[in-house]
A protein has these predicted regions:
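Acidic catalytic/metal-coordinating carboxylates
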Residues: 56-57, 83-87
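The C-terminal output helix
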Residues: 138-147
């Protein structure tokens, strides 16, 4: 059995479920300049039946045709060119209110306060427990369904 199967079994036991919007499958977009982190999160989310896609930068995500299908954004704070809060602000300016989970390897109370004040759903310092991430993604997708 591989890693994906092990994750799928653990998550099924915890009761995580796939969230779907009526008549469409929202994408969980992961934006992280660390390819290994982005791919690991993508694998985790796919293992519970979510549609997920990793992007290496905010610019790549903004130019993606998947932007319109995104129901949840998991974004790293510390990235070159455009950090996670800047990406969130750019999306807001474009009228794209995407429920967002901000992750960071360099946690600070200031960034946490700014993120939550801006409207970010969850703030997770790396390394985080996969169940915490899944709870945040679940909350974000539930919020997206309300819109």
């Amino acid at each position: 059995m591989g890693l994906a199967n092990d994750i799928r079994i653990r998550n099924a036991a915890r009761g995580y479920r796939s969230c779907q919007m009526p008549n469409s499958r929202p994408i969980v977009a992961i934006v992280d300049d660390d390819e290994a982190v982005g791919n690991a999160i993508e694998l985790l989310l796919r293992s519970i039946g979510l549609v997920a896609q990793a992007f290496s930068s905010g610019d790549e995500f903004l130019l993606s045709p998947e932007l319109s299908r995104t129901g949840c954004l998991v974004v790293d704070f510390d990235m070159p060119k455009m950090n996670g809060l800047d990406l969130y602000a750019n999306l807001s300016r474009l009228g794209k209110e995407i429920p967002t989970v901000l992750i960071t390897a360099y946690p600070s109370d200031d960034i946490r306060a700014r993120a939550l004040q801006a409207g970010v759903i969850c703030y997770l310092p790396k390394p985080f427990d996969e169940s915490d991430l899944l709870d945040c993604v679940q909350t974000a997708l539930d919020r997206a369904k309300e819109k």
